Amino acid sequence: MAHIIDGKAIAAKIRSEIASGVRELQGKGVTPGLAVVLVGDDQASRVYVSMKEKACNDAGIFSVEHKLAAETSEAELLALVELLNNDPKIHGILVQLPLPSQIDTDKVLEAISPFKDVDGFHPYNVGRLSVGKPVFQPCTPYGVMVMLREAGVELKGKEVVVVGRSNIVGKPVAMMCLAEHATVTLCHSRTRDLPDVVRRADVVIAAVGRPEMIKGDWIKEGAVVIDVGINRVGEKKLVGDVEFAGASQRASAITPVPGGVGPMTITMLLQNTLESAKRGMAE
């Protein structure tokens, strides 16, 4: 039976370190500040935003929320972003996605100062990540890497298979694994013989958004499985992208869903905000 990599416990440890870093900065007269912008009334987005607000409060990070109506124009949103870019009390800006259809998401993300882009989505930060010199790392992949480190998983020379090529998780986590000297295969919907590719992996990172798509018997004996997926099945059941029951019989270590990667995402957002405030002081 696999060792369960407990995301809640790892997140709690990192958050305690963040809170201590925040107190240290406050002793020097600086409180890290995060601005969260929510456009419209998407229920899931509202839940995420309130979770982020609570996490900030717990860590001692100053957080301000800007709630805009669903009919807000692109120009109005861009004007707010510009205001936040120039606000010295704000070290991180997060625009909650998805945005309403009248707003060009790329244009908004590119308007955020790369030095306040705590989500790590600005092309400048994507480029820095790709050459191994990141300023901000995207929160979920960053969380995955911290979990692997905390679980004592050495990536150097290992075969890592990433399933899913999104800009939010798949591509950045593949680049981060490369930076740790792993041999990385990035799979997607057009990959041939996916089960055979996954069976080669020492580490499987699943981020495809399809419930239990990766079957337990695809997992090599002793592999490490990081399941980024979170899918609702029926009314109440949450499952990952990996068939947990079967995979946990073969893997040496595995993340559960829920309680695995999920808690790490907001934790790394706090970490990025703290790092941004520290960087601001050094300048």
UniProtKB/Swiss-Prot annotation:
Keyword NADP carried by entry: yes
Gene3D superfamilies per UniProt: Leucine Dehydrogenase, chain A, domain 1, NAD(P)-binding Rossmann-like Domain
Gene Ontology MF, one: methenyltetrahydrofolate cyclohydrolase activity
Protein name: Bifunctional protein FolD
Family: Belongs to the tetrahydrofolate dehydrogenase/cyclohydrolase family.
EC number of the protein: 1.5.1.5, 3.5.4.9
Swiss-Prot/TrEMBL catalytic activity: (6R)-5,10-methylene-5,6,7,8-tetrahydrofolate + NADP(+) = (6R)-5,10-methenyltetrahydrofolate + NADPH; (6R)-5,10-methenyltetrahydrofolate + H2O = (6R)-10-formyltetrahydrofolate + H(+)
SUPFAM superfamilies with a match to the protein in the record: Aminoacid dehydrogenase-like, N-terminal domain, NAD(P)-binding Rossmann-fold domains
InterPro entries the record matches: Aminoacid_DH-like_N_sf, NAD(P)-bd_dom_sf, THF_DH/CycHdrlase, THF_DH/CycHdrlase_cat_dom, THF_DH/CycHdrlase_CS, THF_DH/CycHdrlase_NAD-bd_dom
GO cellular component: cytosol
Positions contributing to NADP(+) binding: 164-166, 189, 230
NCBIfam families per record: PRK10792.1, PRK14186.1, PRK14188.1, PRK14189.1
Subunit-level organization: Homodimer.
Protein function: Catalyzes the oxidation of 5,10-methylenetetrahydrofolate to 5,10-methenyltetrahydrofolate and then the hydrolysis of 5,10-methenyltetrahydrofolate to 10-formyltetrahydrofolate.
Keywords noted in UniProt: Amino-acid biosynthesis, Histidine biosynthesis, Hydrolase, Methionine biosynthesis, Multifunctional enzyme, NADP, One-carbon metabolism, Oxidoreductase, Purine biosynthesis
HAMAP family named among the record's database cross-references: THF_DHG_CYH
GO biological process: L-histidine biosynthetic process; methionine biosynthetic process; purine nucleotide biosynthetic process; tetrahydrofolate interconversion
Pathway membership: One-carbon metabolism; tetrahydrofolate interconversion
